[in-house]
């Protein structure tokens, strides 16, 4: 039965993508034929991203020098790619040693160089440094940085070489010298800690039958507080976890508001709804205008990556007003980072939205288009409903037919789908859901690289 369901889902996903490809979509890279990108060479002394190398937005902090006798030496792997020339002036093979992430990016760059300039190869002049020839806390000491040129040493090519390094996925690229380009990557554990789109296990949701529940304890049949596309509160079925890692230690963005005082933790690539500038700070989102939080339209609230939310912007929180519960915009007071070891969980509801710690968030991550992500999961929701209909004897544990709409604010209650526990992926299996992995893979084929958050999904190095 599950195999059949997966086959049906694949067919539906393909149909959905074909249809969307014929349309002119609202997002970057959507609904249009991808043309070869025009690459612009970096200028001398330019670096991308435009932040310091050892900051969160680039390659991250220095984690300590690696020597041949240290425990961390096993983190380094030799690169024997025949398409790369290693200078290795020390004759120790040190320049070939690097982290797996650095190796993957370097190998990708080698292919780009050969495609850009036939007959020319990538040349590495400096890799891992064990002799202390670089500045203090240089990432060369960790095997996370390389200095590169082209094999013909044609300096007129170096600006474009730097651009190719950016496109290959290096986390920081610097046209450092007229003689070479400097590239570096994040630490392996740093990438894993910051990747994905999740909430910590300590986050809470509101249940239809009253009370709250830790997000890590959600199970099929639970109905949790969410919002529709007009910003009205309702209860929606919890379907599955798109990602679940009980033992994860993650870096979360901490979004805090003061009036009312709320605190939400979520990973960098997760989507959070932000109110437009003309949305009254004291009023409810107007249903008549279609400007409710989940719409993501140009004039209404939009969903942003958590890493892009800034103090002064306004998010939607649940507040009591005139004895009624409703969504109100609240100004973000601070955005900080916190490392938590409470696990990481990405719940999916039928509505595609969820109230976490009384703050409205999307169920989706990786791509900054909530509406498109929700459409992409339509086949999954359909399969879930079909399988539920095939097992009418089973009922949801979270259902309470007499509960009505306890969310207030004129909200609507979604119908409970019996047999939800039998839906594909409804169990609490650890790891990333197979459907999410499928969509991510398709997205990497169809979308521009800028459309996907760089920390959207932790991908194992090959």
From Swiss-Prot:
Changing residue 236 to R: In HPE3; familial. This is Sonic hedgehog protein. Pfam families: HH_signal, Hint. Keywords: Autocatalytic cleavage, Calcium, Cell membrane, Developmental protein, Disease variant, Endoplasmic reticulum, Glycoprotein, Golgi apparatus, Holoprosencephaly, Hydrolase, Lipoprotein, Membrane, Metal-binding, Microphthalmia, Palmitate, Protease, Secreted, Signal, Transferase, Zinc. Changing residue 24 to S/A: Abolishes palmitoylation. InterPro entries: Hedgehog (IPR001657), Hedgehog_Hint (IPR001767), Hedgehog_sig/DD-Pept_Zn-bd_sf (IPR009045), Hedgehog_Signaling (IPR050387), Hedgehog_signalling_dom (IPR000320), Hint_dom_C (IPR003586), Hint_dom_N (IPR003587), Hint_dom_sf (IPR036844). GO terms for molecular function: calcium ion binding; cholesterol-protein transferase activity; endopeptidase activity; glycosaminoglycan binding; laminin-1 binding; morphogen activity; patched binding; peptidase activity. GO terms for cellular component: cell surface; collagen-containing extracellular matrix; cytosol; endoplasmic reticulum; endoplasmic reticulum lumen; endoplasmic reticulum membrane; extracellular region; extracellular space. It comes from Homo sapiens.
């Amino acid at each position: 039965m599950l195999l059949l369901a997966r086959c049906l889902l694949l067919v539906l996903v393909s149909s959905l993508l074909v249809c969307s490809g014929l349309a002119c979509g609202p997002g970057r890279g959507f609904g249009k034929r991808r043309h070869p990108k025009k690459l612009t060479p970096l200028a001398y002394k330019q670096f991308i991203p435009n932040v310091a190398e050892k900051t969160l937005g680039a390659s991250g902090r220095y984690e300590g020098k690696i020597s041949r006798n240290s425990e961390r030496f096993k983190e380094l792997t030799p690169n024997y790619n025949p398409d790369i020339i290693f200078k290795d002036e020390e004759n120790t093979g040190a320049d070939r040693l690097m982290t797996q992430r650095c190796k993957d990016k370097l190998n990708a760059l080698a292919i780009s160089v050969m495609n850009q300039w036939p007959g020319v190869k990538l040349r590495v002049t400096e890799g891992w440094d064990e002799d202390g020839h670089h500045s203090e806390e240089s990432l060369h000491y960790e095997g996370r940085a390389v200095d590169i040129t082209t094999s013909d040493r044609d300096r007129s090519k170096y600006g474009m070489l730097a651009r190719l390094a950016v496109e290959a996925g290096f986390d920081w690229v610097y046209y450092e010298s007229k003689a070479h380009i400097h590239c570096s990557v994040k630490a392996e554990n740093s990438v894993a800690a910051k990747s994905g789109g999740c909430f910590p296990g300590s986050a809470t949701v509101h249940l239809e039958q009253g009370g709250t529940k830790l997000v890590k304890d959600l199970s099929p049949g639970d109905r949790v507080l969410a919002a529709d596309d007009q910003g009205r509160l309702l209860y929606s079925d919890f379907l599955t976890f798109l990602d679940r890692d009980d033992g994860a230690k993650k870096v979360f963005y901490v979004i805090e508001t003061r009036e009312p005082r709320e605190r939400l933790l979520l990973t960098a690539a997760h989507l959070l709804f932000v109110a437009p500038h003309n949305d009254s700070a004291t009023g409810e989102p107007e249903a008549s205008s279609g400007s409710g939080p989940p719409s993501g339209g140009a004039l209404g609230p939009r969903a942003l990556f958590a890493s892009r939310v800034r103090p002064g912007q306004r998010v939607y929180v649940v507040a009591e007003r005139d004895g009624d519960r409703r969504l109100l915009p609240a100004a973000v007071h601070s955005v900080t980072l916190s490392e938590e070891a409470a696990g990481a969980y990405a719940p999916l509801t039928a509505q595609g939205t969820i109230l976490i710690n009384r703050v409205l968030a999307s169920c989706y991550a990786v791509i900054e288009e909530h509406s498109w992500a929700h459409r992409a999961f339509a086949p999954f929701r359909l399969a879930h409903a079909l399988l539920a209909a095939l097992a009418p004897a089973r009922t949801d544990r979270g259902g309470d037919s007499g509960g009505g709409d306890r969310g207030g604010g004129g909200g609507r209650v979604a119908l409970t789908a019996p047999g939800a526990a039998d839906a594909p992926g409804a169990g609490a299996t650890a790891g990333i859901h197979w459907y999410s992995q499928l969509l991510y893979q398709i997205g990497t084929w169809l979308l521009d690289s800028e459309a996907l958050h760089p920390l959207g999904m932790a991908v194992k190095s090959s």
